[in-house]
Amino acid sequence: MEKPDLYVVARFLDIMFSNGPSMKKTNIQMLLGVNYPRFMEYLEWLLKRDLVAASLDEEGTERIKLTPKGIESYHRLVDWIKETLDGVKI
């Protein structure tokens, strides 16, 4: 994916920031509202840029969490969208 939709990236980061320290991929995908192949493209894009990280929990389930860089990006991108596009829901 060369040019992701920044609104989808913002929604992804917002979901991660708002729903706890880590989440299962399926839960993120359902909240994001995109099909699974498209979700995986965004996840891979975010992983390559160190905005999110994958790890296994104690049960061996893969979980995704925001990195410090992802938290910073969340604040910059999502806050900018909320300020600039007054009334737009992320």
Q: What would you call each of these model-derived segments?
A:
Residues 76-90:
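Amphipathic alpha-helical dimerization/coiled-coil segments
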Residues 60-77:
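Basic, amphipathic "hinge/linker" alpha-helix immediately C-terminal to the N-terminal HTH DNA-binding motif
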Residues 21-31:
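Short acidic, hydrophobic short linear motifs in intrinsically disordered regions
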Residues 2-3, 33-48:
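Short amphipathic alpha-helical interaction segments
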Residues 47-57:
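A short, conserved structural fragment
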Residues 13-20, 78:
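Short, locally clustered residues in the helix-turn-helix/winged-helix DNA-binding domain
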Residues 1-13:
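Short alpha-helical segments that sit at the start of domains
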